[in-house]
Amino acid sequence: MKCVYFGSDVFLPCLARLVGDGHEIVRIYTFPDNNGDFSHCRQMLQAAKELDVPVRLNRPGAQELESLIEDDAQAFISAAYAYKIPAFSSEKAYGLNLHTSLLPQGRGRWPLPRILLDSPQAAGVTIHQLAEAFDAGAILAQTPLALSEDEDLDSLTAKIIMATPPLLSGVMGDLATCWANAQPQDEQQASHWPVPEGKTRTLDWTQDVASIMHKHRAFGGCMVQASVDGQTIWIEDVNAWQEAHTLTPGTIAARYEDQLVIAAQDGLVLLKRWYQAG
């Protein structure tokens, strides 16, 4: 099947699976590597070069898609793509999106932190039809994922990356049947989660160390914020332990080299990699 692929590095294994399954990639859409929300497309650009596939960095226009359909493009596949794909008739071509939650729960650009924070039942992968509203199209296939007690953003991302290519392969292998049997999403069960910011992404030193580590794991290398000594900082890597102390939560208990130890409710938190905000 002739496919147009929209995506970034995180789902590059899906592109490789499509090629391995014999599908023809006629164009790849990605975006400049300094894009603020999705900053990893170097491998996608390299893959396009190796496959000798035309690549575009612009936002696609409706006329571009119509021209591709006229040139016999049959499927438009979106996976961690930064821009909205213009609508086109499903009678002319298939439009699919890969989403990192069990829809209809967890609509939105980045559901993984919320899944890890308080919604483990939404962990999974969904492939759905492109629709006018983001993440609202009928479901073609999905698979749930189990979370471990110490699941973090990196491990959940890895599980999703491993689960998605075979799921996509199955859909593409019998796309007409999957399309005909697609299940509309239950709007009464739907939830839309904005990109977490503010309090949701900020450590609270008055909490216990278990809660602090839980929030850190939900964001991992994408970092959480915290206030230390009156300054806002971004924290990339921490450790923590329970220990009795008499310090006020948020107090700097120790400072050495570039690391800080901060008092929490029932223990201490070691900031191993952190950066001044701004």
Model-derived regions, located:
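Short, solvent-exposed recognition patches
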Residues: 231-248
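One-carbon transfer enzymes
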Residues: 1-227, 240, 254-260, 264-277
